[in-house]
UniProtKB/Swiss-Prot annotation:
Tetramer of two alpha and two beta subunits. One of its GO terms (biological process) is glycyl-tRNA aminoacylation. Its main location: cytoplasm. The gene is glyS. It is found in: Cytoplasm. This is Glycine--tRNA ligase beta subunit. PANTHER family: GLYCINE--TRNA LIGASE, CHLOROPLASTIC_MITOCHONDRIAL 2 (PTHR30075:SF2), GLYCYL-TRNA SYNTHETASE (PTHR30075).
């Protein structure tokens, strides 16, 4: 008869960002443990709050399934001695399996007999197997861990309780310094220690102690309560998904409420108010029906609505202190001069091994000028890029950004506009940080995009030049994100800037502040980001073929990846790739100094292929170019069927290989077709 298993780990308050992944990890690790230990089950449900991680297994088998395994041993000629007795090798083999030589039988494998034994292991009761379940808890990994009391071990937070129930029976286990039982803890203020009656009563037992253990239910409660406030107050609440996920992991019993602040603070830029509420206080922003910011906020209390008025007043008081700071910095920063702030950037360190922010900006300005030409910007846009590059970090020295660093760039745009800077310049100051996350928003203007590229390129080259290169998962300076941003921006704007030539030109630049080095590593790093971008849809062989092409133009490479993926599902893909691959492989033997001499042609097929190559313009989209190359497949095959490429006559051989080399030089601008897999 199956049973239900409950495991709850009671801890000190967990960081909100750890709760959900830890809940998931616990469920996955327990499922693996049960599977590896041959305990079947029907379902696993996980639970979490800031003070507990729990999992319930439904339909758990009473005992392990029996195990029957065959083991292959030494060959018969080794297993038997000259007298036909079992050798030490055979005896040692069966002894290692916990058996005797009576269990030995011989089986033929590929014409030779080998020792085989069959071992039968009866399944153990589930209760006995579950005594080892603490290894699941011990194996849990966390971003940070800590010691407590005089213990030598580490965990995410101090552990207070461990509840392990098989139906209504408490299993006795030891984990760290805790002995398991059926005692759990209710809400920190509204509950007490409580007894969990059974695995099935878990949610109800803790609900009576003002703890909602199901994270999804807490989320639904929060959303429903906010929706009720919206209707009652006639407003709209920005239910930011990331904030919602954070807040639900800060509370065990959620109660949403609305607070207010003075309307005078609405004169401060909206971004300042939103940052104060959302990022610093974990409040939800309130708007009117037209979408305008209201002097209100919604917060979620960890508790019921008892004395909620006092809670509201306390939250309002804390927020007003933040808003006062914002209002003060907004007023005082407007008295500052951009030129003065830029001058002070010479004293701000970009990185101790690289130099100052001012030096970083100087290099960025030079790179931006080069990129502006490559991107065919207008004269007005070139001027805007240059001006933006001169000042774009000035807001880092304002009081507002010093207090609210999330507003860097955003406040730069606003202060630049107030100072009379061109709108394109101001926008570029904000956009140069984009994208600021994987999949984040990209710059919308060409000026902002060029500045973003230049800033990221100098950052990448500078850190690589001083040996600060990401390794493994370690990337403290977010160089992978910056490089991914470079790739995404180039693709978004369709700028066909050859990255290899661009990087070469940057390494030719001379700066007093820094000399760029490690070019090969930089190029490989950029290739890896392009590979990752293609990897969303393209298999490995297609990615490798494109990365081995003679073209390093990001938009074209990504377009070719898409075209090849689509083409790989067509009938002519395999024969076309195979004929091109043959040409590629033979072209590797080409003498680069040999030019095709039509007077040496001995058959019509040579003439036809050469003419087709000469007429190959590779115009249009990536799909159209691929179609043009694939269309040569019959001509290539006809050439191979009627021509001995590796002729004994050296002149003929060189000439024919040169024909193929001409083909490859054009086709390789798309991909190295011999890297593609047609099996």
């Amino acid at each position: 008869m199956s049973k239900n298993l409950l495991i709850e780990l009671g801890l000190e308050e967990l960081p909100a960002y750890v709760v959900t992944p830890s809940e998931k990890q616990l469920g996955e690790r327990l499922a693996t443990f049960l599977t590896e230990n041959r305990l079947s089950f029907e379902d696993i449900q996980t639970f979490s709050t800031p003070r507990r991680l729990a999992v319930r297994v439904s339909g758990l088998a009473d005992q392990q399934t029996d195990l029957t395994e065959d083991f292959k041993g030494p060959a018969k000629k080794i297993a038997l001695d000259a007298d036909g007795n079992f050798s030490k090798a055979a005896q040692g083999f069966v002894r290692g399996k916990g058996l005797t030589t009576d269990a030995i039988e011989f089986r033929e494998v590929k014409g030779e007999e080998y020792v085989y034994v069959t071992k039968h292991e009866a399944g153990k009761p589930a209760k006995e197997v579950l005594l080892g379940v603490t290894e699941v808890l011990s194996a849990m990994t966390f971003p940070v861990s800590m010691h407590w009391a005089n213990n030598s071990f580490e965990y995410i937070r101090p552990v207070h309780t461990l509840t392990v129930l098989l139906n209504d029976e408490a299993l006795e286990l030891d984990f760290l310094d805790i002995h398991s039982g059926r005692v759990s803890r209710g809400h920190r203020f509204l509950g007490t220690e409580t007894t969990i009656t059974s695995a099935d009563s878990y949610e109800a037992d803790l609900r009576s102690q003002c703890v909602i253990v199901d994270a999804k239910e807490r989320q639904e409660m929060i959303v429903e309560q906010i929706k009720t406030l919206e209707v009652e107050q006639g407003v709209q609440v920005d239910i930011d998904e990331d904030l919602l996920n954070e807040v639900l992991n800060l509370v065990e019993f959620p109660t949403a409420f609305m607070g207010n602040f003075e309307a005078k603070y609405l004169d401060v830029p909206e971004e300042v108010l939103v940052t104060s509420m959302k990022n610093h206080q974990r409040y939800f922003v309130v708007r009117d029906q037209a979408g305008h910011l209201m002097p209100n906020f919604v917060s979620v209390r960890n508790g019921n609505d008892q004395a909620i008025e006092n809670v509201i007043k306390g939250n309002e008081k804390v927020l007003v202190a933040r808003l006062e700071d914002g209002e003060f910095f907004w007023r005082e920063d407007q008295k500052l001069q951009i030129a003065d702030l830029v001058a002070k950037l010479t004293n701000v360190t970009f990185h101790e091994k690289i130099g100052s922010l001012a030096e970083h900006m100087d290099r960025t300005r030079v790179i931006a000028a080069s990129l502006a030409k490559e991107a065919n910007l207008s004269a007005e846009e070139v001027t805007a890029v240059d001006r933006a590059a001169q000042i774009y970090k000035f807001d880092l020295l304002t009081g507002m950004v010093g207090e609210f660093d999330e507003l860097q760039g955003i406040m730069g745009e606003k202060y630049a506009l107030l100072a009379g800077e061109d709108a394109a310049v101001a926008t570029a100051i904000r956009e140069h940080y984009l994208p600021d996350a994987a999949g984040g928003a990209l710059p919308e203007t060409k000026v902002g995009a060029v500045l973003a590229l230049a800033d990221k390129l100098d950052t990448l080259l500078s850190f690589f030049s001083v040996g600060l290169i990401p390794s493994g998962s370690n990337d403290p300076y977010a160089l992978r994100r910056a490089t991914q941003g470079i790739v995404r921006i180039l693709d978004h704007f369709g700028w066909r800037i050859p990255m290899d030539k661009l990087v070469d030109s940057l390494y030719d630049l001379s700066f007093d502040s820094l000399t760029y080095t490690n070019k090969a590593d930089v190029m490989n790093f950029i290739r890896a980001r392009v590979d990752k971008m293609m990897g969303k849809a393209a298999p490995k062989d297609i990615r490798e073929a494109i990365l081995a092409s003679s073209t390093f133009v990001v938009p074209e490479m990504l377009a070719v990846a898409e075209a090849l993926v689509k083409a790989s599902h067509t009938e002519n893909y395999k024969p076309a790739v195979e004929s091109l691959s043959r040409a590629f492989n033979l072209a590797e033997k080409a003498d680069a100094s040999v030019q095709v001499d039509p007077s040496l042609f001995e058959n019509e097929q040579e003439n036809t292929l050469f003419a087709a190559i000469q007429g190959l313009t590779l115009a249009g989209s990536a799909a159209q170019q691929l179609e043009q190359v694939f269309a040569l497949s019959p001509v290539i095959n006809d050439f191979f069927d009627n021509t001995m490429v590796m002729a004994e006559d050296q002149a003929l051989k060189n000439n024919r290989v040169a024909i193929l080399s001409d083909l490859v030089s054009k086709a390789k601008t798309i991909a190295a077709f011999n890297q593609l897999n047609t099996k």
